[in-house]
């Protein structure tokens, strides 16, 4: 039986989010609707999640002592990492000492904080099909890996980054030094190690939102949302849609792979598992033990969004992954470099039939920073995509 207390009282059920961006903000709102007291933590002030949490803190989350001090002060029941750049070894110690439970598990946060840990788990331990890959910690070893079998074209990424930061598509050797320097500059913690991957010729990419929750019999069960298709530019998600049409054979394979990798990570919560698909063939790409940016589309498509599913699963509550209707999402970019921007033409954006928007409230805009998202629902995927893009395009960011 799940027991939830009263926020801001001695009986409160307390959840601490490490990372308070736009995805964390939606998780906070979902938790608060269930009566949870939420503490939001990020590395900068006035992050989106700070604006809606019961309490907000700013600390360097890679600082183990600062992280421990805050956890001991706030005494959360659950710690929910929403980003990769965290002192995960300290989280493991906190969990081992019984101070708080880490979602989904401390081990999962350690493995998924960098691409090396999760790729070795998926490909080498679980035997999942992936692209050819290698790891390198110098330009010389990177060159040797490419010449030794990865080949051109290839993709180079920092082992630790997110949202496409530091990612390059390299066509030939003349572009290698630039890609190496870019990857090193964008890595969040370990700035000297990269993964290089062979390019997979795929038809489309999907995110399979996978939920591990506790069923009525007390055992962990695994449920899947309808596949989310998405389009990326330079590693950044720019639009997504649900459901992505695909063969039953490919979908069954993706579900089997997702169940295997999330089962190996353990714990409860929602995972974003990414795949490349060509015909009936499926390649595992990445997994995040938290809601996924491409899953913002579920705000318009599912009975319970990915954020509500995550909140319910971590609290031990029943989940419903059913699709309500097709839909799509499109990103609203900053377009400027400025603080405290304003958004014009919001009325015009919302005049597009069957659409809604979310403005994230980020304190600073960058040219390619995601400042909001438009979502559309309907009966036809392509029509939903067109309306989401239209609504997003009508919003104007001004200084």
UniProtKB/Swiss-Prot annotation:
Q: What Gene Ontology terms describe what this protein does at the molecular function level?
A: ATP binding; magnesium ion binding; phosphoribosylglycinamide formyltransferase 2 activity; phosphoribosylglycinamide formyltransferase activity
Signal sequence bounds? none
Keyword ATP-binding applies: yes
Q: What is its EC number?
A: 6.3.1.21
For binding Mg(2+), which residues are annotated in this chain's numbering?
A: 274, 286
Domain of life assignment: Bacteria
Indicate whether Ribonucleoprotein appears among the record's keywords.
no
Q: Which InterPro entries match?
A: ATP-grasp (IPR011761), ATP-grasp_carboxylate-amine (IPR003135), ATP_grasp_subdomain_1 (IPR013815), PreATP-grasp_dom_sf (IPR016185), PurT (IPR005862), PurT/PurK_preATP-grasp (IPR054350), PurT_C (IPR048740), Rudment_hybrid_motif (IPR011054)
Residues holding N(1)-(5-phospho-beta-D-ribosyl)glycinamide: 22-23, 82, 293, 362, 369-370
Gene Ontology biological process terms, A to Z = 'de novo' IMP biosynthetic process
Q: What class of enzyme is it?
A: ligase
According to UniProt, this protein's pathway is: Purine metabolism; IMP biosynthesis via de novo pathway; N(2)-formyl-N(1)-(5-phospho-D-ribosyl)glycinamide from N(1)-(5-phospho-D-ribosyl)glycinamide (formate route): step 1/1
Quote the record's binding site residues for ATP: 115, 157, 162-167, 197-200, 205
Q: Which GO terms describe its cellular component?
A: cytosol
Q: Which residues form a coiled coil?
A: none
Question: Catalyzes what?
Answer: N(1)-(5-phospho-beta-D-ribosyl)glycinamide + formate + ATP = N(2)-formyl-N(1)-(5-phospho-beta-D-ribosyl)glycinamide + ADP + phosphate + H(+)
* UniProt keyword terms in alphabetical order: ATP-binding, Ligase, Magnesium, Metal-binding, Nucleotide-binding, Purine biosynthesis
Ranges where the ATP-grasp domain occurs: 120-315
Q: How does it assemble?
A: Homodimer.
Its family remark reads: Belongs to the PurK/PurT family.
Its biological function? Involved in the de novo purine biosynthesis. Catalyzes the transfer of formate to 5-phospho-ribosyl-glycinamide (GAR), producing 5-phospho-ribosyl-N-formylglycinamide (FGAR). Formate is provided by PurU via hydrolysis of 10-formyl-tetrahydrofolate.
The name on file for this protein is Formate-dependent phosphoribosylglycinamide formyltransferase
What is the primary gene name for this protein? purT
